A protein has these predicted regions:
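Hydrophobic residues within the alpha-helices of tandem HEAT/HEAT-like
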Residues: 25, 40-44, 74-82, 116-123, ...
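Solenoidal tandem-repeat scaffolds enriched in leucines and small polar residues
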Residues: 124-213
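N-terminal alpha-helical scaffolding segments that mark the starts
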Residues: 2-53
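HEAT/HEAT-like alpha-solenoid repeats
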Residues: 14-19, 49-60, 64, 85-102, ...
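Acidic, serine/threonine- and proline-enriched intrinsically disordered linkers and terminal tails
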Residues: 4-5, 306-402
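Eukaryotic helix-linker segments that join adjacent hydrophobic helices
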Residues: 62-117
Length: 406
């Protein structure tokens, strides 16, 4: 840390005011919220505003989790939206302060810490934050399960945000990914499902860009995918299916020797009771159909694939109820747009889905967290959202229709 950053200390009055604003931020009164937002907007103009936020988040352990998490989220947003205005001294201060937060005992605070570190890595770049990469790498092997999970979660976020920059990073002639890829492969067998998912999610980012570090470990990765194919957690199987799609599009020759087994697995997974797993498996057939090098292997399997796709196209009872008021137009001739799927082509559609996730606050990462929520209760809003998804979003039925059109 620079001398200026090391010698920084807050003004007591300013720190006290900020903490009080964060305490009040839980109020539901509109006028209180308006006043807090106005005051924070004014305070955010001071040069060391970020230092105050990180100090409250990391060091003020006597405050409520809600108070500290507000400070942390504001720090993350300030970094993300105002990076050019943040001084090198403030960046150095945050780099020094934030890494110990990976071992916070509170889940909310740890999650906020992972977000701050991921954004900070985007701002300063991996090659300029060797300590950050080194700490994450070491923490992945921590005996503290929470710290290890936080480190893997952070690296998954960074991998999603900047895979090319991680791949290009060299430090004193060494590529960090040459060390990290084997470590991630090992983590896919971890007893904790969260860690398995973070590892698979990270590795998938480097498959997509054709990373040399990934290429050197592809045989090991394909073996890992086969090992995790029957994982008890649907979200792990979802990432296995996603990985197989990426391998098929990038290194199809790696699957060729075991293609019969892969086909059997994907047929089974396309009928998985978890629709997220089934949808990812269905994407595999889209990629399969578009890969001319595999046409000879696809053709003999069509008699088994097509009935599965037709079965998956059947409307659910809920969908039929939703369409009950739609006018019957069976006597009217179909237009081309009625027949041709709106999302056509596996590669194109996957790009749309990836862009959607990146442009909407990292939905994929939020989905990972949501899938570990054991609360199966639905409220009315969640049911409405589900109905909207069925009506308008890409789903298993539409994917299978697209496949048959292909």
């Amino acid at each position: 840390m620079t001398t200026a950053a090391a010698s920084w200390s807050p003004q007591p009055e300013g720190l006290a005011e900020l903490v009080e604003l964060f305490r009040q931020s839980t109020s539901t009164e509109r006028e209180v919220q308006r006043r807090i937002a106005h005051r924070l907007d004014a305070i955010s103009q001071i040069p060391d505003y970020l230092n105050y936020l990180v100090l409250v988040f990391v060091q003020m352990t006597g405050e409520e989790v809600s108070t500290r998490s507000v400070a942390g989220l504001l720090a993350k947003n300030h970094l993300y939206f105002n990076a050019p205005r943040v001084s090198p001294e403030s960046l150095a201060f945050v780099q020094h302060m934030i890494l110990p937060a990976l071992s916070f005992s509170d889940t909310v605070l740890r999650n906020v810490a992972t977000q701050i570190i991921a954004v900070l890595m985007q701002v300063v770049k991996p090659v300029n934050w060797i300590d950050g990469l080194s700490t994450l790498t070491q923490a992945m092997d921590s005996s503290d399960l929470n710290e290890a999970e936080a480190a893997l979660s952070t690296f998954a976020k960074i991998s999603e945000d900047m895979p090319e920059e991680l791949d290009a990073c060299e430090i004193q002639g060494m590529r960090p990914l040459d060390v990290l890829i084997p470590k991630l492969l090992h983590a896919t067998a971890h007893a904790d499902a969260r860690i398995r998912v973070h590892a698979l999610n990270s590795l998938n980012q480097f498959i997509q860009i054709g990373s040399p570090s990934m290429s050197a470990n592809m045989d090991a990765y394909v073996a890992v995918l086969f090992q995790r194919a029957t994982d008890e957690r649907p979200i792990v199987r979802k990432f296995v299916c996603k990985a197989l799609v990426y391998v098929l599009s990038t290194w199809p020759e790696k699957l060729a020797p075991d293609m019969n087994s892969v086909v059997e697995y994907m047929l089974y997974s396309t009928q998985d009771s978890d629709e997220d797993v089934a949808l990812e498996a269905a994407e595999f057939w889209l990629q399969f159909a578009e890969e001319p090098r595999l046409s000879e292997q696809l053709r003999p399997n069509l008699p088994r694939i097509i009935p599965v796709l037709l079965k998956c196209m059947v409307y659910s009872e809920l969908s039929l109820l939703m369409m009950g008021d739609i006018q019957d137009d069976a006597a009217e001739p179909d237009r081309p747009e009625d027949i041709r799927p709106r999302h056509y082509g596996g590669t194109m559609h996957r790009s749309e889905r990836d862009d959607e996730a990146q442009g909407s606050g990292h939905k994929s990462r939020a989905a990972i967290d949501a899938d570990f929520d054991d609360d199966d209760e639905w409220d009315d809003d969640e049911l409405d959202d589900d109905l909207d998804d069925e009506a308008g979003s890409w789903n298993l039925r539409k994917c299978c229709a697209c496949l048959l059109y292909t």
